[in-house]
Amino acid sequence: VLSHDLEPNRAYAEVTRTARELKEVGPRLVNLKKNNKVALLYSIDSFHAIQYMPFDDRVNYQTVLHQMYGALYRLNAGVDFVFPNSTNFSDYKLIVVPPLYVADDALLKRLAEFVRQGGHLVVAFKSGFANEYSTVRWTKAPGPLREAAGFYYQEFANIRQPLKLKGDPLGIGDENNKVSVWAEFIIPETAEALANYDHPFYGKWPALTRNKYGKGTLTYEGTYLTDKLQEKILLDALNLAGLAGPDQQLSASVRVRHGVSNMGKNLHYYLNYSSSKQTFTYPYASGTDMLTRKRVDKSQAVELGPWDLALIEER
């Protein structure tokens, strides 16, 4: 913290301020409880299987996982990680699934039941293809997910050059309206095609589908998306799940996270990750900024200084 002169400096002042603030409010922040309604399913078996038998030298399991998580982060959606052996799928309204290449029938049936009961799934390509032993299923893909997904496929291909989607169906602009790396030749049964390839051969099959199954929906990505396209798909899924709101309307540099304190009060953390001032309209119940001790009312304009934060505790 101190430089070679051992004198207080800018960094020392920052650390001092942080320590003072933590001393003042820290006891009310410990044991923070999160109630996220979005989960990301992480499969270490799928990670290793795809590493062992890669489908591309540019994209792998981690690439898609990071893309999906990054999109949710930019959308200000709080995310939990769940795993194939997790038993709490019903705690969530939306589960996002990177390529679930390795999965037993029981897991895929649990995901289908999650949708049937009113949950929403966003599932990446190659999911449901192999069983728990990384052996390709002797059935049409995506195996036990077929009914919930509303389609099947028997063929797939590598795409060496990006392909555009026909007609910019998600309204993201020409630069981001393209896919690459992988294409599954999806044959819809009950699923709706959200987007098709703009190509004389691949255009026969949808790139993105959505199926209503029971009380929920399953959105499927049969190809590798651009970051903006992934973000738009996940924003649509948040809307379907009833989870989109004012947090998704904040400026790109403002992040917000929520929790419940050990005193049972709702906390809202707003962080400005930019060198310019940011102003937003506070949408939650009236409270107090724990750092400035100023009252903050619902619908009040709140200003964040560069690289600053507001920590609002509801009354």
Regions found by a protein language model. Name each.
Residues 1-315:
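Carbohydrate-binding surfaces of carbohydrate-active enzymes
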